[in-house]
């Protein structure tokens, strides 16, 4: 699927697990478009944040079942990507500056 660069990365994931991965292994977590490939994620992160990406690992997270009263629905499945950066590169968005 042909996606624009700004459509590939949806938002950063700021969780405790993602913070541990960032501090220990220079891995940054993002929610990405469900149809995006690892190559598209790599190109998008490099272009948007001006960094050098070494590795991309992706996983599809299952949507949770949700209830509102008697009605039962389901949130959609979504994809997350852990991106490993070159030594010395950082993304200011995650650093809180």
From Swiss-Prot:
So which residues are the signal peptide here? none
Q: Which GO terms describe its cellular component?
A: ribonucleoprotein complex; ribosome
Supply the Pfam families for this chain.
Answer: Ribosomal_L23
Q: Which InterPro entries match?
A: Nucleotide-bd_a/b_plait_sf, Ribosomal_uL23-like, Ribosomal_uL23/eL15/eS24_sf, Ribosomal_uL23_CS
Listed GO MF terms: rRNA binding; structural constituent of ribosome
| GO biological process, alphabetically ordered | translation
Organism's domain of life?
Bacteria
Keywords on record = Ribonucleoprotein, Ribosomal protein, RNA-binding, rRNA-binding
- Function recorded in the entry: One of the early assembly proteins it binds 23S rRNA. One of the proteins that surrounds the polypeptide exit tunnel on the outside of the ribosome. Forms the main docking site for trigger factor binding to the ribosome.
Subunit composition and interactions: Part of the 50S ribosomal subunit. Contacts protein L29, and trigger factor when it is bound to the ribosome.
Per the record, the similarity remark reads:
Belongs to the universal ribosomal protein uL23 family.
Task: Report what the protein is called.
Answer: Large ribosomal subunit protein uL23
Its source organism is: Anaeromyxobacter sp. (strain K)
Upper lineage is: Bacteria, Pseudomonadati, Myxococcota, Myxococcia, Myxococcales
């Amino acid at each position: 699927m042909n996606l624009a660069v700004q459509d590939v990365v949806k938002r950063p994931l700021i969780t405790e697990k993602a913070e541990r991965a960032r501090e220990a292994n220079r891995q940054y977590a993002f929610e990405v478009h469900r149809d995006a490939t690892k190559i598209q994620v790599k190109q998008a992160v490099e272009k948007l944040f001006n960094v050098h990406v070494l590795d991309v690992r992706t996983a599809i997270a299952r949507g949770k079942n949700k209830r509102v009263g008697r009605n039962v629905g389901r949130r959609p499945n979504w994809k997350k990507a852990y991106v490993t950066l070159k030594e010395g590169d950082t993304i200011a968005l995650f650093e809180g500056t």
